[in-house]
Structure formats: structure tokens, C-alpha cells
């Protein structure tokens, strides 16, 4: 499985709400995401790790 790209739509307390490029919505705990993640950030999930794109 290749990388999946997401855009952070909103942050609600300890969770980021994001949408993948294919339109799938996801909610992820902020502590799992890279430092500096904000609304509008582009993230890549690959091999169970997150990084800023």
C-alpha cells in the first residue's frame, strides 16, 4: 500500500479531522501527528507513520 495524502480540515481539542485526497474522512489523535500540524496542513501516512508533506 502506497502513501495516503490528507488535508487537515479542523482541530477539535486533541483530535484532527482530515480528508484524504480520495475523499475519505478520518479523525486522528494529535499526539500521533507531527509537531507543527495545523488546519490546512498536508500530511502523508505511510507505513503507519505520519509526516508533513
Residue ranges, per PLM feature:
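Structural detector for short beta-strands of small beta-barrel domains
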Residues: 1-11
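Residue-level signal for tight coil/turn positions that link beta-strands
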Residues: 12-13, 47
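Glycine-centered tight beta-turn/hairpin loop motif at sheet-sheet or coil-to-beta transitions
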Residues: 1, 21-23
Amino acid at each position: 500500500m502506497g502513501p495516503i495524502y490528507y488535508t487537515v480540515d479542523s482541530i477539535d481539542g486533541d483530535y484532527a479531522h482530515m480528508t484524504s485526497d480520495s475523499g475519505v474522512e478520518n479523525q486522528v489523535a494529535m499526539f500521533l501527528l507531527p509537531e507543527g500540524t495545523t488546519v490546512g496542513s498536508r500530511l502523508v501516512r505511510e507505513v503507519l507513520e505520519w509526516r508533513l508533506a
